[in-house]
Curated annotation (Swiss-Prot):
It comes from the Bacteria. The keyword Ribosomal protein applies. The keyword NADP does not apply. It comes from Thiobacillus denitrificans (strain ATCC 25259 / T1). Keywords: Ribonucleoprotein, Ribosomal protein, RNA-binding, rRNA-binding. Belongs to the universal ribosomal protein uL23 family. This is Large ribosomal subunit protein uL23. The lineage of its organism: Bacteria, Pseudomonadati, Pseudomonadota, Betaproteobacteria, Nitrosomonadales.
Length: 101
């Protein structure tokens, strides 16, 4: 496989995941958590974070989150499944979503 196109890198990351756990791993393990495209690879995610946020990536771990079964009145429905990526940054690197930088 050749180089990843810049257009693909801009589409890979959908949104940061802000939760108690993501805040905890950001402080303790220097990781940031993103919601990504379901077909994104670890290499694409790492390259996208490095190019978009101008940081050095040490590693990427991904997991598929299954959609929960939810009820709306009598009807049972299912939320969409999605993919989550934990991106470990090299020491000294930081992405701060709270300040918008």
């Amino acid at each position: 496989m050749g180089a990843i196109s810049q257009e693909r890198l801009l589409k890979v990351i959908l949104a940061p995941v802000i939760s108690e756990k993501s805040t905890r791993v950001a402080d303790k393990l220097n990781q940031v958590v993103f919601r990504v495209l379901p077909d994104a690879t670890k290499q694409e995610i790492g390259a996208a974070v490095a190019s978009l946020f101008k940081v050095e990536v040490a590693g990427v771990q991904v997991l598929n989150v299954k959609g929960k079964v939810k009820r709306s009145g009598r009807v049972m429905g299912r939320r969409d499944s999605w993919k989550k990526a934990y991106v470990t940054l090299k020491p000294g690197q930081d992405i701060d979503f709270a300040s918008g930088q």
